């Protein structure tokens, strides 16, 4: 789906998410984790590590990545791809800020 036909949904304020933290939203059967970095960048990933489906929302946010709490896989917040020697990826979603409102791209 391209940006012109993308459906944007407000999922709350950036102030609802602590720096280096996350919040989850439901989308059908899927849970999407919304992450906020220390420098207020916001990212969205399916809340499922590509290794053993661990809850990424419960991981540690650092350096543009999140570390899965189950087996310490490091996942890029931008792409959803595993870093280092690990292979696999989780779905990443487009996200933007409109003032302080987090807009999640679905489609």
What are these language model-derived features?
Residues 63-69, 82-91:
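Short cysteine/histidine-rich metal-coordination sites, predominantly Zn2+-binding motifs
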Residues 55-62, 73-84:
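Iron-sulfur (Fe-S) cluster-binding segments and ferredoxin-like electron-carrier domains
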Residues 1-63, 89-107:
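N-terminal pre-ligand scaffold of iron-sulfur
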Residues 49, 68-71:
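Short cysteine clusters
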């Amino acid at each position: 789906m391209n940006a012109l036909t993308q459906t944007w949904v407000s999922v709350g304020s950036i102030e609802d998410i602590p720096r280096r933290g996350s919040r989850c939203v439901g989308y059908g059967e899927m849970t999407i984790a919304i992450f906020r970095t220390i420098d207020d960048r916001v990212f969205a990933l399916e809340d499922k590590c590509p290794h053993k489906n661990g809850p990424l929302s419960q991981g540690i946010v650092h350096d543009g990545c999140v570390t899965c709490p189950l087996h310490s896989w490091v996942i890029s917040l931008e792409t959803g791809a595993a870093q280092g020697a690990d292979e696999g990826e989780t779905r990443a979603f487009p996200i933007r800020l409109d003032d302080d409102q987090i807009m999640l791209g679905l489609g």
